[in-house]
Structures are given as C-alpha cells and as structure tokens.
Amino acid sequence: MRLPWELLVLQSFMLCLADDYTLHGPVFVQEPSHVMFPLDSEEKKVKLSCEVKGNPKPHIRWKLNGTDVDIGMDFRYSVVEGSLLINNPNKTQDSGTYQCIATNSFGTIVSREAKLQFAYLENFKTRTRSTVSVRRGQGMVLLCGPPPHSGELSYAWIFNEHPSYQDNRRFVSQETGNLYIAKVEKADVGNYTCVVTNTVTSHQVLGPPTPLILRNDGVMGEYEPKIEVQFPETVPAEKGSTVKLECFALGNPVPTILWRRADGKPIARKARRHKSSGILEIPNFQQEDAGSYECVAENSRGKNIAKGQVTFYAQPNWVQIINDIHVAMEESVFWECKANGRPKPTYRWLKNGDPLLTRERIQIEQGTLNITIVNLSDAGMYQCVAENKHGVIYASAELSVIAESPDFSRTLLKRVTLVKVGGEVVIECKPKASPRPVYTWRKGREILRENERITISEDGNLRIINVTKSDAGSYTCIATNHFGTASSTGNVVVKDPTKVMVPPSSMDVTVGESIVLPCQVTHDHSLDIVFTWTFNGHLIDFDKDGDHFERVGGQDSAGDLMIRNIQLKHAGKYVCMVQTSVDKLSAAADLIVRGPPGPPEAVTIDEITDTTAQLSWRPGPDNHSPITMYVIQARTPFSVGWQAVSTVPELVDGKTFTATVVGLNPWVEYEFRTVAANVIGIGEPSRPSEKRRTEEALPEVTPANVSGGGGSKSELVITWETVPEELQNGRGFGYVVAFRPHGKMIWMLTVLASADASRYVFRNESVRPFSPFEVKVGVFNNKGEGPFSPTTLVYSAEEEPTKPPASIFARSLSATDIEVFWASPIGKNRGRIQGYEVKYWRHDDKEENARKIRTVGNQTSTKITNLKGNALYHLSVKAYNSAGTGPSSAAVNVTTRKPPPSQPPGNIIWNSSDSKIILNWDQVKALDNESEVKGYKVLYRWNRQSSTSVIETNKTSVELSLPFDEDYIIEIKPFSDGGDGSSSEQIRIPKISNSYARGSGASTSNACTLSAISTIMISLTARSSL
C-alpha cells in the first residue's frame, strides 16, 4: 500500500504530464455479453469481448465464477487486447459466469457478469414406442419426451412421413413438444414421429415413431372440453420481450378457443393469435400488458376456463449515472446514481473492485455516496452497482484528489485595475491550490486590515468601496496552505468620473420632421469613451437603420443622435449610454410623435335598409393630434377596390362615431371601413366590417342598347345588354319584352324569367320581311315590375337576294392577281343587297374547297391576289344580305399569266466618269414556263435613306447622275406580264472620290457618310436593245 506522501508525489507527477497526455482511470468501451456456444460448432473457439481505455494502459484480468482465470496454467486461454479467447471450449470446465477486471495506476473497475453456456441436443434413447389405441371421437395426447439438451428447442411432428399441420383439431405444444388431437378421426390412424430442433445449433433429431390405431369397441360420445394444455398460474414476462401463452383442449365436438383478460380490459391490438388459437402471442411486452388472462374452451356440451397471471419484470436500467470528480483535499464528494427496474433495484458501491462500506467519513445510503474531508487515500475508481433478481448493471467514475501548494502562474492578479473616484473595485485572487489557502493582502508593504470600506471575501477577493485618490497603488495577494505560500501583485489606478453635461431632453415632434437629441459629457481624456443609444430598450443599429438614425457631434465628448424623417414608429424612450473603462452612465428622454390618426376600431353595421346603412365605430389613437373628421368607404363584389360613399351627416367630425351611409344599391353585399383624419394627414383605414346585404327593392335600371334585326324568315330578333347584377335590386330578376308593328297601338308582351337573357326571337308567318317594329324592354324582380327602356325601331328578318349578279367578267393582271367585274341583278329582286360574295377555286381543286371574298355596298368589281401562276381558275358571284346569300351566277374562267423570270440580272458592272454612273448587266432569259422579259427596274437609294426610287428601262444599261458625297445602294430586277422577277443582290456604289472609278456587283467599298443632297439628276442612255 502506498503512503499518502508517495501518492502525492505520484499525483503531482501526473499533473505535470497533463499538458501532454490525458491521464485517467480505466473506462469500459465494450463489456462482455452472455454467450450460448454450440457444442457442434466447426469453429472451436469462444470469445468474451472486453475493450477498455485508460492512461496508463489498463491491465486486464478475468474471473470465472469469482475465481481468477490463470492464463498461464491453461494453454487454451489467452487475452487479446482485453478480450478472453478460449480454444477448444469444454462444457464441464468452461461453463459459468465470467467477469472482466481492468486496472491501472488510478484504480480498478469490474465489468458486468457474462454467462458462458453450451448449446447441444442429444439423440433419443428409445428406439421404439408402444402403440396408442383410442376410440374414434376420443381426445388424445402423444408425448414427445425430448432428449437431454441445452438451449431453446422447437417442436414439430411427422405423420406417415409427412408434416403434421396444426389446425383447430391438432396442436403441438412448444413448451413440452407433445402433440394434442382434440377429437380423433379415422384419417388420424398412422405413425407419428416427434421432430426436435435446437434453435441455437440448428441440430435436429427425430424420435421413435408412435403408432396410432382405432379401437373396435365403439365410438366416443360427445363430451365437454377438457383443457390439456394451459399456461402456468404465474408467467413472468420481461419488458420488451415476446410472451407466448399456450392453451388447448380435447373434446367432442372439437372445442373453440377464446382469449380474454380477466379484468375486462381489451387485449392489446398488437397481440396475435395463431391458426388454432392455441397460442396468444404478445410482442414488445410492457407494463400495461400485465394482468390476469383467461383461456375459454367451449363446445356444444359445455366450456372450461384456464386462468393465469402474467407479471411484468424489468432488468435494472440507468436513469442517472455517476461522473468523474476532481476535488481538492479536505472538501466533500457526493455521488448519486438512479436506476429503474422491476422489482425496484437495490444498490451497492465498489472502490477499486472491492465492496465499499459505511464508516466515519463515508456514508452510503441506497444510490448515494457521501465522502467528507477528502484525503489522498480516497482517490480511486468507484462503481455504483444496481441489481434486482433479473440483472445487474454497473456505473463507473473516477475520484481524483488534488493536493498542491498555491500557484499563481495561470491566474496572476490583473496588472492594472482602473476605478473611478467614489466607485467600487474588486480585485480577484484565484490561485490554484488544494486545500483552499488562507488569504492576506498588502498595499505596498503594509498589511491591509478590513474596515467599513475594505473587505476580503472567503475566496480571497479584495473589495474596496467609495474609492478615493489615496486608494491608488500596488496590491499583493498572499495565499498559504499546508504545502506552501505564493503571492501576486497588481496596481489600482483611480480616475475622475464621467459626467453628463448636456443630456437629451424630451420632445414633441410631427411626422416627417428631423431632430437632434444631444448627449455631451465631461470625462477623463486618458480613457476611451463609447456612446451607444437604445430605443425602447433595443440597441440602435446605425448601419441597418441609417435611413433614420445618425450619430453626430464631431468630438469625443459628444454623442448626439440625429433622427431624420421621423415616423410614428419612432415614438418612445431614447437612452444615451456612455461607457469608459471605469464607469458607465446613461441619460434618457421621451420622444412624442404627432401624426395622422391610427385606424378606427370595431366598425359595425347597426342597421341596414335597401339603400342605407347605419354604422358605428370606436376611435383609434389620435397620435397626439385631435381627429377632425372621418371618411366612410365601401366595397362590394362588383366594385374596383374601396370607394368613398355619401353619408348623413355629409361631413362626419372627429367627435362623431356613427353615420348613415346613403345611396346604396338594393340587394348588394356591402362591407364598410372608416378612415380618420387630423390636421397632419389621413390615417390608415380600419379593418373591414362584417359583410351585409341591403334589402330588396323594385328594379330601376333598364337594359341598354336595345336593338335587333337579322334572323330567319318570319322572325323578329330583339337584343339588349343585360342589367348588371349589382343593379337588379333583388332576387327573381327578369325581363319583359314589348313590341308592336310600327304605327300600331297594341303591344305584344313576353316575360323572360332569367337575369342572363339578352335576346328574344318572335316567330310568326305574318311577319313580313324587313318590316319595322317598335320595341322596348322592361325589368322585374320579386318586388314587382320596373320601368321600360325607351322605344326603338327594329326590323324583322329580311329575305336573301333572289337574283344572281349579271355580266360576270374576269381578267388576269399578273401571275398572282386577277380582277373580276359584274353587274347588279337584272329584274325585280325581293331581297335587299348589302354586298357581293366572290367564290374562286383552281381547276385542280374541288368547288367545295373554294375560297371567298366579300365586297360591301354597290361595289361591282374586286381584285383577287396571291394566286398560282399559269393556272386556270373558276369564279362565281352571289349577292348577300343579313339573311344570307342569293343564287350564284354562272361560273367564268380565267388563267393567270406565267410567273415572272426567276433568274436575277447577272454580271452587273458599273463605271463612273465626269460625275456619272453607268450600270451594265447581262440580259435575263425567261424559261419556258415563265413570261417574257419586258424590261428592267433599277431600285436605288442613298445609304442613309429608307425610301427607294425606281427607274424602268427596256435596255440592259442605265446612266445615273449622282452626288459626290453619298454612297448608293442599288438593286436590279426584270419585269414581265407575270409581274416582277427575282432581284439582284444589293450593290453598294461608294461616293465618287476621283474622276474615274469602276466596279462590279461583287465589289465593296468603305464609304464615309456626308450630308444629303436634295436633288438628283438622272439621265438614261441605251447601250443595247433587247
């Protein structure tokens, strides 16, 4: 056993190394777990894992059933990185409980216990079994009698070399392996073999066959259920486990199995019943699943009940563990650990792997450990152990006891402490020391004595209040304990206090104004000073709120605040805070902002009629300026936004909180809001009122644009614009259509009960074509009839023209254009003519695909464009009016001319001499399917102009008189009876810079743009004839 002095030296040495290495006791990273090892495993090796960290590296040893495992005495054992390896494990020698023990210079900890068991399954000893003889209808049990084994088993049966399936008549108990047949039938005769499987090793063995035969002495009569398989009276179930309860009965008829809880509670929905209902399975078992369960077996002869109690248990589980503690000598240690479990866990404590008992300084009470007046011998590894009959858990922690002389190396006194006259100063003295030292203070060379101004706290800090200039100087803290003495010195510098000379003053301003709140001080200029401002308790961010706030002043003793374009939101308390390294002070002012009123509140519709609404409201904040008036606004589903409405009184003053809105439309849903105003401006509107609909009234607005005409023979068509919904004044809105022949006295009336109706057609054989009628349209709703529209004249449907146009003639103008001529119909024509319709189609097309164009009025010719060249077209003409088209004229034929030449002029050459430009080009030859060339068009323009001039010539040259200071853009194309041919590429002729120049169509030139000349002289000279 080490002496306390040796422990102190060792601990001091470890603390010296702490800067480079983290020294600590053992800590389990992985603890051993229970192992079920298959005896027939091909890998003849068992590993019990144990991984530990610590510094110094811990030494690992193992215990088996409480006795140390001697690795050196048995070559089969080895420890690899803490884990225990057992080669060729032996069931007799190696079965038992193992524990890993880890030790280093800080102490020892023990792991949880881990059991090593061996799984095996031997063969059945008996070779044959006796024949079982039963009556038909009798219940039967075939015993399995599994051979010696270790590890969980599963059971099945083979019937005549085939698996025996379980159903409501047959059941295999997984507890005993026995096969139960509730009621034997003739088909059950045969050989039965029990099949046993070890679920750990997967090894399977078959029992000897048991023959089953039927007796010849009759059939078993009916009898009530006899429960042969039932779960125990008490079934302990672990938290989170899967619980299986078995129950099966013999009987005739075959009994049904029903499960229920004896306390009347429903069985959890998560529970499952197997095919035969002989097993009730409850997964993830919890406290609420515990209770009394009943199995009810019933048939027509009666029923029987088996009962059992399923109890809940849980292994201990940590709720609170212990943690490492570093404590100074002579102080106290308190640890507490808590664990859940059922039954409730008990606690014990270990120190360095050995039991820890209560004695003078050590008090143990359940999960608490209290050590007083700690000394070096208390250092070590501690473990709290919580256990119940279902398990044991361990929590570990290290207790380090610190013993050292006072040391200021890392906690020197502050070199300079600044304080103001009249202020307070605290000089901290925090040396590292264990146990706690005794403190004394010196000022200069004199020991400080406590008085009403000077106190020394228990933890060594020096406090001086009401500081004066004489308190300046050097101060030394001296710390002493059993192991030595140390000191540290610092200086106190006393400064004059800061004073606010010009504080901010409260002000009353108007929205939009700008002000400056002053904040000017006197202070010790050897100290840095910082001004900050808060607004309603929040620090002003001058970067974020720079649009409104700015620091002004220009000197270190002034921190004035400018507020620009003040808004209502800027009203509140402003605080100027001044801080130096020795003091902090503040000055506050209130800013009152006058502005437009806030929104009125609680706008309510007190009463509403067909055209009025009585409103009331509560005033909102006046923002420090009396409200002078209110404006009422309304909105409907048909309005564009909010609209001001008329009220009584016409002007609502600021002391009136009710008004009547007039001029509303009946049967329209309205909502209202109020806007307040004062001398400063108009405020925000109130929240909208509830929506209310005005009452119904007679309609007052008549349809607009009453007209008509058209339609079919013997019809009078009357049309109008519907009355908007907001002007219909009520439900059941419709129209009354009145009409009479012009000059007659009696009106004919028709009622249309639809607000959407906008057209009425009167049909009668007596209606003559294009006869005038007087027409008016009235309105009505559920309240009654409203007015009629003004009377207007509408003509009945007219008759389409009855005669075709005469003298149809067509001529070709070009390859794409033709012109058509005709004369008005000859003889009496009953229908009015509004114009003519020309139909045309190519000879290769069908007439039904013909195109049509129309003329208006008396026009008797038209031009048709965009046709195909050298193609035969057929044309016919009809007269038309609103009733339709009349008969068609006879068709005439016309052939468009051949297309113009497709080849553009080539080999274009130009020469300039004596201010003239002479252009020459090759003659264009038309193809066989093209019309002959009649001449050429020369298109030219100045470089900076968009308008183009044209010269026509039947020659292949042209002479132009051009200015000297402008480029020319020129194109040339042929023309023929078929129209204009393809154009040449554009030619740029540069301005004339010398007396002679020449070029071709491919040449280019860089030209400078000069001022335009207003006149161009052009002369033509024939070079060759076509």
Swiss-Prot record:
The keyword Transmembrane helix does not apply. GO terms for cellular component: axon; extracellular region; plasma membrane; side of membrane; synapse. One of its GO terms (biological process) is axon guidance. SMART domains: FN3, IG, IGc2. Residues 1001-1026 form a propeptide. This is Contactin-4. Residues 687-696 have a biased composition (Basic and acidic residues). Keywords: Cell adhesion, Cell membrane, Disulfide bond, Glycoprotein, GPI-anchor, Immunoglobulin domain, Lipoprotein, Membrane, Repeat, Secreted, Signal. Residues 685-710 are annotated as: Disordered. Belongs to the immunoglobulin superfamily. Contactin family. Glycans are attached at N65, N90, N191, N370, N375, N466, N705, N764, N858, N893, N911, N929, N954. Residues 32-117, 122-206, 225-311, 316-400, 406-493, 497-586 form the Ig-like C2-type domain. InterPro entries: CNTN4_Ig6 (IPR033007), FN3_dom (IPR003961), FN3_sf (IPR036116), Ig-like_dom (IPR007110), Ig-like_dom_sf (IPR036179), Ig-like_fold (IPR013783), Ig_I-set (IPR013098), Ig_sub (IPR003599). It comes from Rattus norvegicus. It is found in: Cell membrane; Secreted. A lipid is attached at S1000 (GPI-anchor amidated serine). Residues 599-697, 702-799, 804-899, 900-995 form the Fibronectin type-III domain. Its main location: membrane. Specifically expressed in the nervous system. Not expressed in heart, spleen, lung, liver, kidney or skeletal muscle. In the hippocampus, it is highly expressed in CA1 pyramidal cells and weakly expressed in other regions of the hippocampus.
